[in-house]
Amino acid sequence: MSQAIVVAALYKFVTLEDYVELREPLLKTMLDNNVKGTLLLAHEGINGTVSGTREGIDGLLAWLRNDPRLVDVDHKESYCDEQPFYRTKVKLKKEIVTLGVPGVDPNQAVGTYVEPKDWNALISDPEVLLIDTRNDYEVAIGTFKGAIDPKTETFREFPEYIKANFDPSKHKKVAMFCTGGIRCEKASSYMLGEGFESVYHLKGGILKYFEEVPQEESLWDGDCFVFDNRVTVRHDLSEGEYDQCHACRHPINAEERASEHYSPGVSCPHCWDSLSEKTRRSAIDRQKQIELAKARNLPHPIGYNYKAEA
């Protein structure tokens, strides 16, 4: 790869009794290796996306894997020319991905992991119910052929969607997927608790599928939304053509950018008629700051605010 920046999405569900104490040494390791991005720590594990040089990412991964609990931390890599993150953060959370249902613990019960090479065969089975566990704006960018879109705005809405639409006695086989594997892994734990018997989820998520399955064999249609400045990636993990509205965070394509309702950093066709005047003024001021920083060839810290896969 000629591109200088490595982007690593990583997570692991593992009991971290000392997650509060881990924050400072983890942050120091990221800073020492000049790694940017955000990692989330909770009692149930670690999650996040970071970026840096090859040496920097390797240094962080080596530090993490020196802890026996994180020796097999799941991570996927892609590459880009510029830093997709401006800040370095480690946040303490109740959950590393927020489902909001007490007692759901992938460390105790989880569905069957399916390797990317075996995914096509599974989802081609007509008896398998294929569910995209991501949010509506992500699904709109791309999904697996034949997948059901729950049309949820946040992962918190997923449990109610399942309760309202599916019956464990009728839906015997369920397969789920998400960007990096974390949401569908937690969703599988929830589904088992609800009585669904055969629950499968894509190991490593869409990004691992892109990495390991040749494009000519792919059952994916479209791009994949990612939680950094690239906005989307294609099947070859190169940066997609989408931008992102800084007002509503919705991905926008070339046609939407040509709309009369699109104003860079201020509004887009998805939000122009719903923004309050206060929000609009704030967005205009922020965009001026971003453009000023760009003119001075400086990164702007509010050009993108990291949001964990959720």
Curated annotation (Swiss-Prot):
Keyword Oxidoreductase tagged: yes
Oxidoreductase found in the keyword field: yes
Domain Rhodanese: 124-218
UniProt keyword annotations, A-Z: Oxidoreductase, tRNA processing
Gene3D superfamilies reported in the protein's UniProt record: 3.30.70.100, Rhodanese-like domain (3.40.250.10)
Gene Ontology BP, a term: tRNA modification
GO molecular function, one term: oxidoreductase activity, acting on paired donors, with incorporation or reduction of molecular oxygen
EC number(s) from the headed UniProt entry: 1.14.-.-
Active-site residues, record numbering mapped to chain: C178
InterPro entries in the record: Rhodanese-like_dom (IPR001763), Rhodanese-like_dom_sf (IPR036873), TrhO (IPR020936), TRHO_N (IPR040503)
Reaction(s) catalysed by this chain's protein: uridine(34) in tRNA + AH2 + O2 = 5-hydroxyuridine(34) in tRNA + A + H2O
Family the UniProt entry places it in: Belongs to the TrhO family.
Function: Catalyzes oxygen-dependent 5-hydroxyuridine (ho5U) modification at position 34 in tRNAs.
Name of the protein: tRNA uridine(34) hydroxylase
